[in-house]
Amino acid sequence: MTGSSPASPLGEAELEYLRSQRIGRLATVGPGGQPHVMPVMYQLTDDGSLEFDADGIKLRNLTAEPRVAIVVDTMGPRRGVAVQGVASVVAPERARLRPRRAFSWGLRPGS
């Protein structure tokens, strides 16, 4: 896939889809390795990162373990993007996910 930067795993179809949506489900890892999934509103940045509010449990978890994932999808027609990466706090109660891996479905003809 070609993305917005040389290291980005997001192709143009994924970027276009992420720009068209606003809500995803963010997965963080809590103490003891317990997964925690919460809906978040996100914003796609110019470099292909995703910014979102991070407070409470999300902030605690990603500060201790920055590896996170987000899924953005729709059900009719079924399509979506799953992104795995590393999150960092960029402002008070604001974090940025830098994608390392991405998977998509239903975004291209025949997929």
Regions found by a protein language model. Give the residues of each.
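Extreme N-terminal tail/first-helix region
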Residues: 1-20
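Short alpha-helical scaffold segments that flank and stabilize functional sites
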Residues: 17, 31, 88-90
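A short, compositionally biased
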Residues: 19-23, 64-66
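Hydrophobic small-molecule pocket/channel-lining residues, especially in calycin-type beta-barrels
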Residues: 2-3, 12, 27, 69-82, ...
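Short, structured beta-strand-loop surface elements
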Residues: 55-103
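C-terminal edge-of-domain segments
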Residues: 1-7, 91-111
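Short beta-strand segments
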Residues: 22-54, 70-72, 82
